[in-house]
Amino acid sequence: KSNQSTRIRLNSTVVHVRHQGSGAGRSVEVNYVHNGLTHKVRGKACVMACWNTVIPYLVPELPAQQKEALAYGTKGPVVYTSVGIKNWKAFENLGINRIYTPSMHHYRVLLDEAVSLGDLHHAESPNEPIILSLARYPAAPGLPKKEQLIEGRRELLNTSFEFYERSIRDQLGRVLGGGGFDPGRDIFGIAVNRWPHGYSYTYNTLDEPWDWVFTSSDERPCVVGRQPYGQITIANADAAASPHTDAAILEAHRAVEEVMSFI
């Protein structure tokens, strides 16, 4: 609205960010594409809140060391699958609410959380329909972590929905069949949510220094990469090397405080 100071540009992809001018008149210019046309805006400062690995391409004037630090990690691929079933009698008959299956395509199967919201009510009886939550973290055992994540992403992108459907029906039939579950009869819907670039990269003691994992060392790539550059600051979960919401919120708070210190 015209009386608001905030402007949100939907469906607009940023392609280039750089400083303009010098001294007190210095600003940040942001170029973006909307409906096939390039536009630009200027401001006193800019917060880069996208993936770390993308930032060096958008802000090519960054120092080489900072670019290297931002490019260090890689996103972890994730598959979260929801399966609608007509009832959960099989779970009741087996006396379980979740199953861990490390040798199958989805490593975990569990009953959805009993949450009601407004007019939407969770299943209260085993005779009622419910959603099953399945999870898979594609990887390639035996390789260093980053290589595993890259190979897992390749697998995810090359796996067809038909394969997911067949493997889900087979898996649920095998683990729940003893409780009377029939995949052909009891499944009424499958939604496969694929995140090829899912969770932020986290450090581990097999491939990286212990202090990166167990301390807040300033030597960590996430710390080197998130340093302010001129009037450009960086905020995202990658900047904390953590996939959690609280980390993203804390990094956003830090980046905005940095902006407030020089505008």
List PLM regions with ranges.
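Short mixed-charge
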Residues: K1-S5
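Mid-domain catalytic core of redox enzymes
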Residues: T6, L10-L143
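Conserved flavin/dinucleotide-binding core of flavoenzymes
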Residues: V33, G84, A90-I263
